[in-house]
């Protein structure tokens, strides 16, 4: 039985707890033993992107120590963006002979949820059933930096009753970009409006994504414009399907 420490991420922990819960239930359904290190905090990405690299190192050290104490075989998180930051910890400590090997060990066992299910557990069909017409938003960090493109599609393609429709300009950023949406709101709004237009043109009833930050941004814009499109994290889709199956 694989032992997994849940990296819940800030947004799942504070704003979208159903994503964290779905992640745990899904992993347990797939035979994993899941633990939750309560001392975990933010991964440090907002600070890093804002240029506070020394402060980010303090956060990274705390996260490395926290998950070392958990002593799990794997660290799994429902966010490509946050997992990417944890995978990049060795870069923060590239000139530190003490912390670099610890950061490398930490990064090596850290996985995004769909990547872990498909590549590590070698599962592409979780037995889900979710009748809906949906489209998938591919988040930037997950595809461009982690290189995860096939895994979400493999899992969603095997969900009974789920019809996936293509999304135009699927690799275009949604405009969130962490602190980017705060620093450059006018540009961010234009970007998310383009994403919303693509979603509407797809004819989908449900928008699925693997990063809560993107879903929060796109979902907020859909709601503001009065569009009744449901927004769901891929963990919720797969888990709800498992519950119905």
UniProtKB/Swiss-Prot annotation:
Q: Which GO terms describe its biological process?
A: lactate metabolic process
Tell me the InterPro entries matching this sequence: Cys_rich_dom (IPR004017), LutA (IPR022822)
Q: GO terms for CC?
A: cytosol
List the Gene Ontology MF annotations in alphabetical order.
oxidoreductase activity
Please give the family membership noted in the entry.
Answer: Belongs to the LutA/YkgE family.
Please explain the role this protein plays, according to its UniProt record: Is involved in L-lactate degradation and allows cells to grow with lactate as the sole carbon source.
- Could you tell me which PANTHER family the record lists for this protein? LACTATE UTILIZATION PROTEIN A (PTHR30296:SF0), UNCHARACTERIZED PROTEIN YKGE (PTHR30296)
Its name, as the record gives it, is Lactate utilization protein A
Source taxonomy: Bacteria, Bacillati, Bacillota, Bacilli, Bacillales
């Amino acid at each position: 039985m694989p032992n997994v420490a849940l990296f819940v991420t800030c947004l799942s922990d504070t704003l979208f707890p159903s994503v964290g819960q779905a992640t745990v239930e899904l992993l347990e359904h797939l035979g994993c033993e899941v633990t939750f290190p309560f001392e975990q905090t933010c991964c440090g990405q907002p600070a890093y992107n804002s240029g506070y690299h020394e402060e980010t190192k303090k956060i990274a050290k705390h996260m490395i120590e926290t998950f070392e104490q958990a002593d799990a075989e794997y660290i799994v998180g429902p966010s490509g963006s946050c997992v990417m930051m944890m995978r990049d910890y060795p870069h923060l400590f590239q000139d530190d002979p003490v912390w670099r090997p610890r950061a490398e060990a930490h990064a090596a066992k850290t996985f995004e949820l769909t990547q872990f299910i498909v590549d590590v557990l070698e599962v592409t069909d979780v037995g889900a059933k979710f009748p809906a017409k949906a489209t998938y938003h591919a988040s930037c960090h997950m595809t461009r930096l982690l290189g995860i493109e096939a895994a979400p599609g493999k899992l969603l393609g095997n969900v009974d009753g789920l019809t996936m429709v293509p999304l135009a300009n699927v690799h275009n950023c949604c405009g969130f970009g962490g602190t980017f949406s705060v620093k450059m709101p006018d540009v961010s709004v234009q970007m998310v409006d383009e994403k919303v237009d693509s979603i509407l043109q797809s004819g989908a009833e449900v928008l699925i994504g693997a990063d809560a930050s993107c879903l929060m941004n796109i979902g907020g814009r859909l709601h503001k414009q009065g569009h009744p499109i449901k927004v769901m994290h891929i963990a919720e889709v797969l888990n709800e399907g498992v519950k119905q199956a």
